[in-house]
Amino acid sequence: MIKIKNKTLSGNINAVQSKSMAHRYIICSALSKEYTKIYLKDISQDVKATIDAIKNLGTDVDIRDDYIIIRESNIKNNIFDCKQSGTTLRFMLPIATSLLDECSFIGHGRLPKRPINDIVNIMKKSSCIFSNDTLPFNIKNKFIC
C-alpha cells in the first residue's frame, strides 16, 4: 500500500514505457500546474492526441528528442481533436468538461463509432448537455463529479 501525504513533491522517477501510462503522466502533469519533464522514447499518435488536447487546456508542451516538458500556459482552444485515440477521448472528456463551460470533441477513423455511452450518460446526469451521443459533439455546462 502506498500512502500519499498532502505536500509538494519533487524529484525523478523511472517510469515504465507504456502508452497507457504516458497518457496518464501527461494529463496529471498538465493538471498539476507545475513544470514537469517526462522521458519518453517514442510518442505514438494516440499520445500525440493527448498532448494536443492538454495544449487546449492551457498547457505548454515542448517535445524534445527523448523527453517532453510540460508547464502551465493559458487556455487556448475548446475544441478537442482526439484523432483516433479512444484513450484520449475517455480521459479528456470528463477533464475538459469539468474545467470548461463549453467545449467540442471530434475524432477520426473508427473513433466516432466506438461506444462511450457509459461516460456520456453519467455526464448527462450531472447537467452536461451533449449535441449528439456520438462524435462529433458539443457539450455545454460543466461536469460536476
Please tell me what each predicted stretch does.
Residues 1-145:
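Structural preference for solvent-exposed beta-strand-turn elements
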